[in-house]
């Protein structure tokens, strides 16, 4: 059987960069890692609660974290900044205060910035979220997959593969369904590929969505 490596980890240092950038002593590494995860979850929860439109759609492509001795810098790459609460500057300030309260950063400053993603549907995370929303609204899985591919094709990507696994359409036996358009060269390290694994809870159980996008 073929062993499937994570396409992002496989390309670190060539076409991919780390989403967290900091140094720590080996004994403190796990604490720093858990802190990163908590910061990301806190930001996602805040955006979910304070969206203008209650669509269940976050539109976050990725959250990058850079740490120094006295500063934690968080950059949120978001596809649809308009979904955030009114007054972008006020929204960022509120988010910053909210995260700072939760973690009690005594000797470190927290700085949050928001960057708009040029082509949202070129991002695997945003696309997976879109498919998940369609499946929650009882849209046929094939229709959701085809619509996602149509949205990606508008962004000049070279190829896309979408896979859904689980009790699709409420069938008793779990199965895997996938669709591919264009080229997705997983073995070529030079190929810039965006990948995402996304879990969604439906009334029938848990479904897993995987997306591979050949960007360049």
From Swiss-Prot:
Q: Which UniProt keywords apply?
A: Chloroplast, Plastid, Ribonucleoprotein, Ribosomal protein, RNA-binding, rRNA-binding
Under the heading InterPro entries, the entry gives:
KH_dom-like_a/b, KH_sf_prok-type, Ribosomal_S3_C_sf, Ribosomal_uS3_bac-typ, Ribosomal_uS3_C, Ribosomal_uS3_CS
Name the UniProt record assigns to this protein: Small ribosomal subunit protein uS3c
Kindly list the places in or outside the cell where this protein is found, as annotated in its UniProt entry. Answer: Plastid, Chloroplast
Q: What SUPFAM superfamilies does the record tag this protein with?
A: Prokaryotic type KH domain (KH-domain type II), Ribosomal protein S3 C-terminal domain
At the top level, the lineage of the source is: Eukaryota
Q: Where is the KH type-2 domain?
A: 43-118
- Organism lineage: Eukaryota, Viridiplantae, Streptophyta, Embryophyta, Tracheophyta
Pfam families xrefs = Ribosomal_S3_C
Gene that encodes the chain: rps3
Which PROSITE patterns did the record assign? RIBOSOMAL_S3 (PS00548)
């Amino acid at each position: 059987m073929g062993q499937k490596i994570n396409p992002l980890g496989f390309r670190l240092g060539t076409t991919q960069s780390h989403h967290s950038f900091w140094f720590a002593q080996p004994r403190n590494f796990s604490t720093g890692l858990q802190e990163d995860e908590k910061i990301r979850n806190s930001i996602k929860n805040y955006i979910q609660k304070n969206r203008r439109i209650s669509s269940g759609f976050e539109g976050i492509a990725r959250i990058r974290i850079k740490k120094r001795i006295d500063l934690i810098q968080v950059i949120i790459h978001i596809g649809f900044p308009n979904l955030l609460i009114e007054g972008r500057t006020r929204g960022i300030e509120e988010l910053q205060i909210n995260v700072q309260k939760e973690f009690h950063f005594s000797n470190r400053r927290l700085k949050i910035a928001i960057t708009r993603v040029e082509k949202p549907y070129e991002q695997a995370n945003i696309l997976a979220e879109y498919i998940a929303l369609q499946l929650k609204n009882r849209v046929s899985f094939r229709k959701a997959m085809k619509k996602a591919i149509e949205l990606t094709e508008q962004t000049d990507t070279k190829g896309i593969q979408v896979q859904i696994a689980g009790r699709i359409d409420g069938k008793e036996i779990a199965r895997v369904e996938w669709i591919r358009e264009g080229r997705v060269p997983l073995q070529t390290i030079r190929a810039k590929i965006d990948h995402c694994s996304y879990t969604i809870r439906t009334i029938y159980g848990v479904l897993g969505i995987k997306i591979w996008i050949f960007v360049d």
